Regions:
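Alpha-helical metal-binding/catalytic segments enriched in His/Glu/Asp
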Residues: 133, 187-189, 202-223
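Short amphipathic alpha-helical segment within the helicase RecA-like ATPase core
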Residues: 1-193
């Protein structure tokens, strides 16, 4: 990389026994710094920290930086572009190469979850939520959508009772991944996916209403 009079050097001093989450938090703080100072081209020079066996400092650092860069701005008429180029300078260890795809998948999954949680209730209603989850089939997942008729047949009366106050229908979505051929018992994750509806009655005080749109965050996290 080229060094000129406009080059800014940032030195990061690391403490011993860093956890992966510490490195990711550091990457997030670094993103705040470069955004505040409008830096557009970043070169990260790897040092001794990256050379430790089994430690992927750069991978976790950039992962934290990318997670911090998330913005939900699809409804803004004027979108501020944060185009930042990151160059990695130096030899990367095998951990970095091996983890690149894993971090990419984690980032895409996290951003998908954040998009779901950030959508307003008049956009992400139950049928729209179920529709978006069916898109996961392209990754080889088995996605099954149970509508009102199927839920009634299966005896999901409590779930249907909650949805009676809405003009929209209720759904239950199951997502299955059978990537392990082991005969051991499968793991099941259950997330609450109650979508906020602006109609009907609410027993909650007004000051708690604005957070109701996050009532489906549990299911979004599971997804």
């Amino acid at each position: 990389f080229n060094i000129n009079e406009n080059t800014t050097f940032i030195l990061i001093s690391l403490k011993k026994d860093l956890k992966d989450s510490d490195i990711e938090n550091l990457g997030g703080e670094f993103y705040n710094f470069i955004k505040k100072n409008s830096f557009k081209n970043i070169s990260i020079i790897t040092g001794s920290a990256q050379n430790k066996p089994g430690m992927d400092f750069i991978g976790h650092f950039v992962h934290g930086l990318k997670l911090k860069s998330y913005e939900f701005n699809i409804y803004k008429s004027k979108k501020v572009k944060n185009d930042i180029t990151i160059n990695l300078v130096g030899k990367q260890n095998t951990s970095f190469t091996k983890n690149k795809l894993k971090f990419k998948a984690l980032e895409e999954g996290t951003f998908f979850t954040r998009d779901l949680v950030s959508e307003p209730g008049n956009v992400l209603h139950p049928d729209e939520y179920a529709k978006r989850l069916t898109q996961l089939r392209k990754y080889g997942l088995k996605v099954t959508v149970y509508d009102k008729k199927k839920l009634k047949k299966l005896g999901f009366n409590a779930l249907l009772g909650v949805g009676q106050g809405s003009i929209r229908g209720s759904y239950l979505v199951t997502i299955e991944w059978k990537g392990n051929k082991s005969k051991s018992n499968p793991l099941a994750f259950v997330g609450k996916g109650v979508c906020f509806d602006t109609g009907g009655y609410s027993l909650k005080p007004a000051r708690f209403m604005e957070d109701m749109t996050y009532d489906m965050a549990g299911s979004a996290a599971v997804v």
